[in-house]
Regions:
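Short glycine/threonine-rich turn/loop motifs
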Residues: 55-170, 175-182
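Post-cleavage N-terminal segment of exported redox proteins
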Residues: 2-84, 102-107, 187-191, 197-215
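Phosphate-binding glycine-rich loops and adjacent basic patches that engage nucleotide phosphates
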Residues: 1-8, 32-44, 125-134, 160-169
Length: 215
């Protein structure tokens, strides 16, 4: 929890490692002067190289293995529209995950911000509105990737759920109504109404996104 000034000073005057940070910054950015902005850019570029692509799901897509029947059912539920079609036009009795966690770039995130129905009000946890000042951003938080989600408990932006079972139960319930709850949530129609075996299948699919070679 040191300040950026301390970080930059340590990088500029590092006498304890074999790395020549000023020279490395010169090679990357054309200057030996290390700044907070350039350090952030360097870290961000490194993080972008950290790509998980060897989960069971990836191997299945490459034809190297098979998903179990339960995992495949979970995948189909993941891709289907939620809700009873008699109540929700277009409903397919699915898990409705794809809207926010579709396969965009196969990172399983739309990289957007959503209110996923955790709380009825946001006085103590405002969300994106703290950044934008736009009232309709109240209670909105960024969609995380689902890769290695089985290894990343606790869940939600505030860590309120300790297991994937709790997460699935939350979405199955439809969430808590609020002024900015996402239209993809099924709070007005009693939730997704997934059966126990369907919830188990969805969780099995989420486990198939685990890539231990990446950890």
């Amino acid at each position: 929890n040191v300040t950026w000034e301390v970080v930059v000073e340590r990088l500029m005057n590092d006498d304890f490692s074999e790395l020549d940070y000023p020279q490395m910054f010169f090679d990357a950015f054309g200057t030996e002067i290390i700044t907070e902005d350039l350090t952030v850019k360097a870290i961000a570029q490194f993080i972008r190289t950290m790509i998980s692509a060897n989960s069971k799901f990836d191997k299945w897509r490459r034809g190297e293995t098979d998903l179990s029947d339960l995992e495949y059912l979970g995948y189909q539920l993941f891709l289907k529209e939620g809700g009873d079609p008699e109540i929700n036009p277009g409903g397919e009795f699915g898990a409705d995950c794809f809207h926010c966690h579709g396969e965009a770039g196969l990172q399983f995130s739309d990289y957007l911000f959503h209110n996923n129905g955790l709380d009825p009000s946001f006085e103590n946890d405002p969300g994106r509105v703290n950044v934008t000042g736009f009232v309709l951003d109240s209670g909105l938080f960024k969609t995380p990737t689902l890769r290695n989600v089985a290894l990343s408990a606790p869940y939600m932006h505030d860590g309120r759920f300790n297991s994937l079972e709790e997460v699935v139960d939350h979405y199955n319930s439809g969430g808590v109504s609020s002024s900015t709850i996402d239209t993809f949530m099924k709070y007005t129609t009693g939730g997704l109404e997934l059966a126990p075996q369907q919830k188990k299948a969805l969780i099995a699919f989420l486990h198939a996104l685990r890539d231990t070679t990446f950890i």
